[in-house]
UniProtKB/Swiss-Prot annotation:
Its cofactor is FMN. Belongs to the Dus family. Dus3 subfamily. Residues 13-28, 61-72, 118-130 have a biased composition (Basic and acidic residues). Its EC number is 1.3.1.89, 1.3.1.-. The active site is at C451 (proton donor). It is found in: Cytoplasm; Nucleus. The keyword Protein transport does not apply. One of its GO terms (molecular function) is mRNA dihydrouridine synthase activity. This is tRNA-dihydrouridine(47) synthase [NAD(P)(+)]. One of its GO terms (biological process) is mRNA processing. Residues 1-145, 292-318 are annotated as: Disordered. It is an enzyme of class 1 (oxidoreductase). It comes from Sclerotinia sclerotiorum (strain ATCC 18683 / 1980 / Ss-1).
Length: 750
């Protein structure tokens, strides 16, 4: 199976799994490779897991580094009230062990290893003592993970049709699926779920259910009717008044889902029938222009000085203008009233974003998509572009703010943007063109320049772009040229190496362009920059450096003045080369460790950022956006938190379907979310506020049994929570938490 998974960054290079070496403690256990995984997720899993499912690393385990740092942190107190750094200050009556006892220290929950959620560096031949790896044979050599589905597969020609009038099966007599509906219902699928009052959430919302007879709630929208000949026929029920009109005839658009790309468009991309004239023209010009720039830069200084005026004029004449200028962009706005939900791999799925928008998130991003699979038409990558209709509504703004962009029209703005990754300019440029063409509801296209994942970094994408500023500028400039009215933004880190920040230079380049291109081409056109206050090397260890973010914010604030200084006094810059023209405002967003409204306000006021992007804080408590809006800490009860989990389950069934596959998919992503959400410590049992994202609690009990259950770090308890809304797991279902070396495998029923 792994041989069929392409490299999403560089297709010409095959993915290699690490060799079997010494058995190590797993920091990130094997994850199942599923068809619906995005390209980068599939590739990560291939490179991360050994032949026997064992991770191999040539670096010191991240968990060990974290433990060492915590020991150093815990040795000092942060205030006069003996608040110990790194330990959540829980009131004494809720502690399971007396304060100061050894049990109190031993009973602390283990540190959540957020680095384990990222890929571990792969090993090499030395990890296996130089021995040649024995190649496994057979098509099922990687079938070590769980799966879920119906025992008997019902043919699609029957799945949504009345019993006596199915559609014509395109496979005819050679079809291997079941066509006997009653046999399928009796033997092929599990019984109906009794959750959600035994009513199908999809049918309740749309008046129809796309899963048809495969639905785990099919009894709520089907009946048996008597025909004239006396036979009893099974039929599906539809509520015509509640049925929604699908977009472009695509059934996937039900349930308030937008940005659904048609199967025809994806097939045209896969078969290279889609023309990308703008991208081809621009990349051809870019290649020729780069050759001339390289030729000039390779001249020795004395050669340049010896050039005659005529030779200099001839060199200038060799430069060819770009084939076209960018279109003027839609104005966008970031402000204190627009907190941003970060692009979250795996966790940033549509149901979770929908929940966050409901709780006050004003701007959202898709999960990071790889550029090559996008313009190759891969279904799993285009699925990341789907958004809920609540994400295409305008963000909430304060119209009285003096910093608001000139000519900004809030009614034309929306919340949802997408993020892509690429390691070559042509990849990013092509992806930007097809996204602006096929995705109608798109606020921005963000280029990821901060992803620390080893697979992405090693091949020149993600945070590796921070060490290739010229290439990064070409990407932004090219994307800006072909994206129509959709603005281009970038998300960066402080740098790749700890103690050697490069973000100031990167920001200056994104704002003005490099010295070699600034005079001829103007600004690259980056509309906004988000800075994560850590280096790639730090990953998620140590606190985000907001003092450095503030230093970068000061540079961005001087952007307009410096832009005027660099502008020729005779010629005004072309508005099409500037973000948010006519004033050319560059927005700046900070990112890192925001976990309360106090953190948010502090960063806005003291770091002088336009807005703050929230990541792990929102995963642990998605009502953080509500706290920011109200300006207070909210002590959510256990029942309220359970309602959010129920909403996620409902939204998941609406997004992924209510059949066995959809229920399993919803269960999987709900468990992924609970692996973060269980870290929340209720505000009402803390001695000190605001809470810190880096604090971990000692062993404690909640104010009631449900609160204690929600705080459990045992994945079996997470399974119990899921079963409240999704019923018992399929016998083949497995779950392996990202942050722990354990897994769940349900015992066979009966």
């Amino acid at each position: 199976m792994t041989d069929e998974i392409p490299n999403p960054v560089q297709p010409e290079k095959s993915l290699k799994r690490p060799l079997d070496g010494e058995q190590l403690e797993e920091a990130h256990p094997p994850q199942p490779i599923l068809p619906e995984d995005s390209a980068v997720t599939k590739a990560e899993k291939v490179e991360r897991n050994g032949a026997n499912g064992n991770s191999v690393s040539n670096e010191e385990p991240v968990a060990k580094r974290i433990k060492t740092e915590e020991q150093n942190h815990n040795s000092t107190a942060t205030d006069s009230r003996d608040r110990v750094r790194g330990i959540a200050p829980i009131k004494a009556e809720y502690l399971l062990h007396p304060a100061g006892s050894r049990s109190a220290t031993d009973g602390r929950n283990p540190a959540a290893n957020d680095d384990a959620a990222e890929e571990k560096p792969r090993g090499d031949n030395r990890d296996n003592g130089g021995k040649k790896k024995k190649k496994e044979k057979g098509q099922n050599k990687d079938r070590q993970f769980g799966s879920w589905g119906d025992k008997i597969k019902l043919c699609n020609s029957t799945s949504n049709s009345p019993e006596f009038s199915p559609k014509e099966c395109s496979f005819g007599e050679s079809c291997k699926c079941e066509h006997d509906l009653r046999k399928y219902l009796a033997e092929g699928k599990r019984g109906d779920l009794t959750t959600f009052n035994s009513k199908c959430p999809v049918w309740e919302d749309n008046g129809t259910c796309l899963a048809g007879w495969k639905c785990r709630f099919v009894g709520s929208h089907s009946k048996e009717v008597k025909r004239e000949d006396g036979r009893m026929e099974l039929v599906l029920i539809e509520d015509l008044e509640r049925m929604r009109t699908t977009v472009a005839g695509d059934e996937e658009a039900l349930g308030g889902v937008v940005n659904v790309v048609s199967t025809k468009d994806k097939l045209d991309l896969a078969r290279r029938r889609t023309k990308m004239e703008k991208s081809d023209l621009y990349t051809n010009w870019l290649d020729k222009n780069s050759e001339e720039v390289n030729r000039q830069s390779n001249l020795r200084k004395d050669q340049k000085n010896d050039q005659t005026q005529e030779e200099k004029e001839e060199n200038r004449a060799r430069y060819v203008e770009p084939p076209f200028l960018p279109s003027e962009k839609r104005r966008i706005y970031f402000g204190p009233e627009t907190p941003v939900l970060a692009p979250l791999t795996t966790q940033g799925n549509l149901p979770f974003r929908r929940l966050c928008v409901e709780l006050g998130a004003q701007l959202t991003y898709s999960e990071m998509a790889m550029s090559i699979p996008l313009f190759q038409g891969q279904k799993s990558e285009w699925a990341l572009m789907k958004a809920h209709e609540s994400e295409i509504t305008p963000p909430r703004i304060n119209p009285d703010r003096s910093s608001i962009v000139q000519n900004y029209n809030n009614s034309k703005d929306l919340k949802f943007g997408t993020q892509i990754s690429a390691n070559k300019p042509f990849q990013a440029i092509k992806a930007a063109e097809i996204l602006s063409r096929f995705v109608p509801h798109l606020r921005v296209i963000d280029l990821n320049c901060g992803c620390p994942i080893e697979l992405v970094y090693r091949q020149g994408a993600g945070s590796a772009l921070l060490d290739a500023p010229s290439k990064l500028e070409k990407m932004i400039r090219g994307m800006n040229a072909v994206s129509g009215e959709v603005p281009i933004t970038a998300k960066i880190r402080m740098g790749t190496m700890t103690g050697k920040p490069t973000a100031l230079k990167t920001i200056e380049r994104l704002a003005f362009g490099g010295v070699e291109s600034r005079e001829r081409l103007g600004a690259p056109g980056c509309a906004a920059i988000t800075l994560h206050g850590r280096s790639r090397q730090q990953r998620y260890t140590k606190n985000a450096d907001w003092s450095y973010i503030a230093e970068c914010a000061a540079l961005v604030k001087s952007y307009n003045q410096k832009k005027d200084d660099l502008t020729d006094t005779i010629m005004e810059p072309d508005a099409r080369t500037l973000p948010n023209a006519p004033d050319g405002k560059l927005h700046f967003i900070g990112n890192g460790d925001c976990y309360s409204h106090v953190d948010y306000l502090d960063h806005i006021q003291n770091a002088s950022v336009d807005s703050v992007m929230v990541a792990r804080g929102a995963l642990i408590k998605p009502w953080l956006f509500e706290e920011i809006e109200k300006g207070q800490t909210l002590d959510k009860s256990a029942s309220e938190r359970l309602q959010y989990i129920e909403k996620f389950a409902r939204y998941g069934l609406e997004a992924w379907g209510s059949d066995e596959m959809g229920v399993g998919q919803t269960r999987r992503f709900l468990l992924e979310w609970l692996s973060f959400a269980h870290r929340y410590v209720p505000a009402g049992i803390l001695e000190h506020l605001p809470p810190s994202l880096q604090d971990r609690p000692p062993a404690y009990r909640g104010r009631n049994d449900l609160e204690t259950l929600l705080a459990s770090d045992n994945y079996m308890d997470w399974m119990k929570i899921c079963e409240m809304f999704l019923g018992p797991a399929h016998e083949g279902f497995k779950f392996q938490p990202k942050h722990k070396s354990n897994s769940y495998e349900i015992e066979a029923e009966g």
